[in-house]
């Protein structure tokens, strides 16, 4: 990518997300999504190779299809209700089409097949933007229409997403695909609580972005893209050895780390609404998610399956780029649970 074009591309992505999040008119919300999509394609093809080109094409086709469904829903909603405001999606069929379009953009099951493939075909930092920043604009639209969405449809999509994300990551050795399937699972949890408490969805999204950003930065520092490379991190960057397992455990939702907080609050929200079956199913399925994180943690330990690790520690440490925000992110990733009473007061 041309260095002179980078500020324009990233500012367009930022502007598109901001327009969608702050817009109260359906047309401008759609324009913001289109700006965001078109500006993000050069980010995916930062390294020009057939794999990144394939990932960009898959991303474009999926997002363009979702945008077409969204535009159809906007026009039908205007014809039937005469309203252009984003908070007024009163028509049942229009609301259903909007949810389907946003589910495609967010990578929810059964529209999730593009997420692992696109993430795998991009560099680590582009994958970070795909799994974090690119969820803000669709999530803002879902937040605005949360009062008029079909609860049964959202719960069905959420449980399918949790199942697809947890099951799909079991046989993966590529770290980017594992994080992509983890993203599908987290989006399922966010959407499940949206009809009951939209603010809880925002809290879940914030914590998810913190956890995922920390994980990608650690993997980028160690240049690890597979479980085999991750197992050799300890002899290159010894200080990463305790940080990567704790971050992965938090991302998997193991108490008492930060990742357990959103799941705990969401389960509590369901119990307040006298629904015990749905959170039980979600929690049981998510245990599969925690399993493949435990497998990754075993790979970063002293042993390497199925034999002991004979790799010697390097006497000279490798130079790494300074990451001033990483200590703060690691602290938030592991120690945010103790301040949960304050968060409950705010919500």
From Swiss-Prot:
Belongs to the complex I subunit 2 family. Disulfide bonds: none annotated. Keywords: Electron transport, Membrane, Mitochondrion, Mitochondrion inner membrane, NAD, Respiratory chain, Translocase, Transmembrane, Transmembrane helix, Transport, Ubiquinone. It catalyses: a ubiquinone + NADH + 5 H(+)(in) = a ubiquinol + NAD(+) + 4 H(+)(out). GO terms for molecular function: NADH dehydrogenase (ubiquinone) activity. It holds the Pfam family Proton_antipo_M. Its EC number is 7.1.1.2. One of its GO terms (cellular component) is respiratory chain complex I. It is an enzyme of class 7 (translocase). Core subunit of the mitochondrial membrane respiratory chain NADH dehydrogenase (Complex I) which catalyzes electron transfer from NADH through the respiratory chain, using ubiquinone as an electron acceptor. Essential for the catalytic activity and assembly of complex I. This is NADH-ubiquinone oxidoreductase chain 2. GO terms for biological process: mitochondrial electron transport, NADH to ubiquinone; mitochondrial respiratory chain complex I assembly. It comes from Gorilla gorilla gorilla. PANTHER family: NADH-UBIQUINONE OXIDOREDUCTASE CHAIN 2. It is found in: Mitochondrion inner membrane.
